């Protein structure tokens, strides 16, 4: 990843970034992907990707690429602060990240031509350009996203751990398609809620592992004929097999057990959806999950700022960022710091992005979703 600043860390150029697995993941054919993995050999260390997915299109001008010297119609309402990297400034609501800026890079060179949410998301997550524009943003992908491809390429963990996890939930516009239902992301639910536990990890009262195995065997006998003729059933069999592995795996149960974290650690990440999702993501990659997609669209179930789609008619970009950005800051700063402290920084790539950015020119509206004057930016 390259930026214009002179930093003490090694510069990672765009080709390397793409080769590592974001946009290029969908562009690489599956045989090529499997061949590269075979070449790497069994001695290579397992690697993971954590995607902090800010669906809606976060504004670069209110986050990591501020223009404080631009005219008022462009620069925006927020102010920059200095970081520990000379010449590099980020938003004032990122004080924690400003102290670890030498541990991440700002990428300004990636772009595409899609201007609607689902089209842009599909381009970023699958590497495939939709054939025609869909201004309604209702399109779903014809190809799997990079997490689904990774799940297929790496195969099932022997200990039942899924390869692809959606922390809170996964992108709604991508589908596993020809790879099969077993490679859809395993969605965890909101880890910040008191009742959080990975979905379906707790067996029904009175049902132990032996009885579960018996029920599974009986179901297999009933389905033996149907599976011979029904291709869809084969995909569901894979999904059911994965679900049973998850149910009975102590490794999975341990990875999802947030009670093992200290109260201080939970506070440091932030007692909110995004902070606890970052903490869960760290635990999951430590347990061997290949791809974790953190749903960072809405800060909470009750937030009026339910996505990053900061049109003037929707939100007030200043007020919305005051809610969002401190939560982004505590979650990402703690995650990046922990990965470095635990020696995982060479094995885990953390990406924070949305499907596109926002226009340089600020727009205004007499009333937004909150019946207040709106200030925002459009798709770009």
Indicate where each model-derived feature is located.
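Ligand-binding pockets and gating/stacking loops
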Residues: 1-380
């Amino acid at each position: 990843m390259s930026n214009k600043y002179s930093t003490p860390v090694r510069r990672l150029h765009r080709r390397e970034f793409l080769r590592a697995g974001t946009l290029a993941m969908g562009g690489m054919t599956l045989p090529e992907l499997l061949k590269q993995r075979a070449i790497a050999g069994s001695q290579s260390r397992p690697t993971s990707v954590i995607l902090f997915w800010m669906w809606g299109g976060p504004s670069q001008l209110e986050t990591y690429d501020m223009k404080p010297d631009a005219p008022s119609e462009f620069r925006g309402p927020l102010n920059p602060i200095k970081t520990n990297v000379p010449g590099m400034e980020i938003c004032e609501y990122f004080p924690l990240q400003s102290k670890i800026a030498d541990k991440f890079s700002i990428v300004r060179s990636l772009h595409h031509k899609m201007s609607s949410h689902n089209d842009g998301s599909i381009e970023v997550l699958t590497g495939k350009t939709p054939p025609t524009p869909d201004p309604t943003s209702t399109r779903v992908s014809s190809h799997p996203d990079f997490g689904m491809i990774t799940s297929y390429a790496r195969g099932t963990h022997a200990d039942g751990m899924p390869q692809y996890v959606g922390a809170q939930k996964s992108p709604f516009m991508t589908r596993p398609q020809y790879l099969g239902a077993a490679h859809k992301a395993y969605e965890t639910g909101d880890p910040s809620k008191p009742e959080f536990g990975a979905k379906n990890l707790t067996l029904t009262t009175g049902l132990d592992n032996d009885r579960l195995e018996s029920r599974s065997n009986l179901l297999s006998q009933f389905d033996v004929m149907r599976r011979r003729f029904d291709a869809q059933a084969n995909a569901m069999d894979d999904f059911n097999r994965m679900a049973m592995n998850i149910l009975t795996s102590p490794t999975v149960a341990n990875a999802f057990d947030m009670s093992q974290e200290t109260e201080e650690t939970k506070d440091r990440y932030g007692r909110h959806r995004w902070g606890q999702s970052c903490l869960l993501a760290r635990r999951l990659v430590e347990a061997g999950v290949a791809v974790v997609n953190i749903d960072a669209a809405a800060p909470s179930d009750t937030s009026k700022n339910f996505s990053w789609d900061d049109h003037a008619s929707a939100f007030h970009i200043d007020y919305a960022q005051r809610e969002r950005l401190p939560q982004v800051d505590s979650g990402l700063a703690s995650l990046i710091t922990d990965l470095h402290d635990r020696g995982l920084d060479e094995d885990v790539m953390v990406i924070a992005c949305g499907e596109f950015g926002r226009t340089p020119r600020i727009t205004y509206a007499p009333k937004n979703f909150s019946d207040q004057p709106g200030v925002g930016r459009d798709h770009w």
